[in-house]
Amino acid sequence: MIRASLKSLLARRVRLLLSTFAIVLGVAFVTGILMFSDTVQRSFVALFDSTVGDSVVRPVNSDVAQQGAVFSTQTVPASLQPDLERLPGAARVDGMVSATGVYVLSTGGKVVGGSGPPAFGGNWNDAPAGHGLEGLVILDGHEPHGADEVVLDESTADRAGYELGDKVSIVTATQTLDVHPTLVGIAGFREGGSLNGATYAAFDTPTAQQLFLDGKDAYTVFWVTARDGVSQEELTEQVAAALPEGYEAVTGDDAAEESAGPLLSGIGFLTTFLLIFAGIALVVSSYIIVNTFSILVAQRSRELALLRALGASKKQVIRSVQLEAFAVGLVGSTLGLGLGVVLAMGIRALVSSIGLDLAHQPLILAPRTVLAAFATGIVVTMVAAWLPARRTGRIAPVQALRDDVALPESSVRRRLLLGVALLAAGIPLALVGLFVGAVPHNGWWVGAGVLAVLLGVTAASPVIGRPFLRATGAVEARAFGPMGRLAGQNSLRNPRRTTATASALMIGLTLAFTVAILGSSAKASVDKAVEDNFIGDYVVSSAFGEGFSPAITDRMAEIDGVTEVLRQRYGFGLLGGDEDDGLSIVATAPETIGDFHLKAVAGSVSDFADDTVLLKEDWADDHDLGVGDTLEVTLPTGAKKWRVVGVVEDSPLVFSPVLTTTQTLLDSGFPDQDNYVVVFADPGATGLQERLDAVVEDLPVVTVKDQQAFAAEQRAPIDRIIGIIYGLLFFAVVIAVLGIVNTLALSVIERTREIGLLRAIGVSRRQLRQMIRLESVVIAVLGAVLGVALGIVFGVTLMYALRDQGLERISIPVVQLVVFLVLSLVLGVLAAVFPARRAARLDVLRAIAAD
């Protein structure tokens, strides 16, 4: 049986080519994603390990601000350094000055990076990293000396177009440097690697202290390097014992883990997100495999019947088909692994082009990736091939020797019953999630219901699709005559095969149109929210979320035509000191609280003052807080207790559940910077946009936007996310189109004698090609119609489920619906090119004689 299976496999290797290619694409997707994820994780772990000392001295609670991606003004005084240097376990102590939001402008005046990875500034230091690792070193040039010299990391200098000796333009959200320092050094890691897209500008220590610490003789942190034989834990114990109250020491490993933790969690989420789409691609691939082996098994029914008649058992026949599937999966997995490496290189290049510079990072091919590639490809192939293999074993040998072997009707009935059962379970699940408020995790109920409905429609598609196939066949017969009639009859000849092929396309288009509705509705909801809640006439903010100098707001307030400015500032704390319960905070001046138009449901907005807070109603209810209670929160300066003076209705004008005063936030260790400013204009003011822009013309990271520009800025991330998802779904659609090509190509082989007879009675090559194209169009249109219908239902359902998240307006993009349907027709025609050409080129006599 093994020899027979291998001979059968070699004899039909061309027929298995497209199925193998489908597995190749699915496995490549999985491999590429896992390789990229491992590469990113390894690079960031190595980066953070190289940017901490053996022991790190910092202000207590300084990590609170870091968790919220905000800047703290807390520092460690330089006077601590001599005491630390006298410790028996300390080899050296280095003071580090570090600040975020320090942007390098390119030679063309554009900000380098900043759209994702941070932009750092600080003092140059050649201290070794923890465990003796080498940190940044000067690769070319020399260290900076004086206020007119700067060192840039290698990637930043390259992206900005600077060479040694050039004058460098550097800005922050608060100021443009008065001097244009000369680039005197290029820094990097001697053993390769990079800052992964972050930018770094280093000055000498006095200059960095003047620029980033207001001239204080202090540092952001100290790095303490351990002597030989002293562990990080031993050194940190010595350091902690020597520190006064208000400062703490942590091991370099712990500091690196704190910095890398949130980022690695995000990478883990991204990996899971991408693997979901890889799973979709593999599911679509499985449809192709089921169809391929169903057709091949049907073509080999006589051969397998003879084997049964010669003594082969039912299990042996099934195992022979499974052996062929194993071989297909093995070849597909091997090729997919190789293509996955290429795909990972492409992902790395794409990500590097948008800011996360990984071009210098070697790709990581971990053993688990290789195992996942082969396990995924082989298991998916063998599971998909098991159904037709099992079906073969159910047909009696004598029956299989006949020419008219047919699938038992009981199989179709079972699929219908399964489909009805899934629909009967899925619809109530979705309804419970949508309308029963007491049920926890409503979104999971809706998601489970949607998935069950999708699987139910797929299972019942042979029955659901029959009326559509008949109707389409009638239309084609009327429009294209005999060839249209034949195409319709061929589609109905094996409705399960036709609908299975269409289901692969249906899944891709269902997801694509669901995403289209979610994206269109999200943008419509954003527009509505901006339209309903945009107060004032202009908003001022940093393009990268950094704070900016209040002097900018002061200058704008003095412009003729500006009647008022409303400032907001952002902070971050830990609720009750719990590291897992972060809390974002918004602050404004008490005298401007009326401009927020907040509606109190308890207490009074007029009681808003320093060391008090207003809470949003839903958040207050969730945390059992009310007027008169105390909100305990840990901030960079320590634990604080704020009195709750009001509970207000939800308002999109306040970007946090907690609102306090500007002075309260300033006293909590956050910088004196505005984050978001609303400008109110005199109704008769003209040319105000230009005058506001003039205030920030030297600060390209701070922008002034009217309502229309602000709405466009809010929509931009949605467009980017939708574009990424479409790109990921493209793989599934490509595989589905390959499925149509595969089914038609195998169908042509299966119907070789029939095609020969058609040619013998006068059907021309052109008519034959037309017939195959029409069959392909039927499959594509069926998949598109089901996909669009389900996409609309799922999209509207999910939007309704997300109504409490601010997505209040449902928008169905009709133009995209039409485009999807037209593209389906085009894909159907293109998918038929190869099979139709093959059918038209068959030799008539050989085709008639074919068995």
Question: Would you name each region that the model predicts?
Answer:
Residues V27-R58, D63, S294, A344-S352, ...:
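Alpha-helical transmembrane segments
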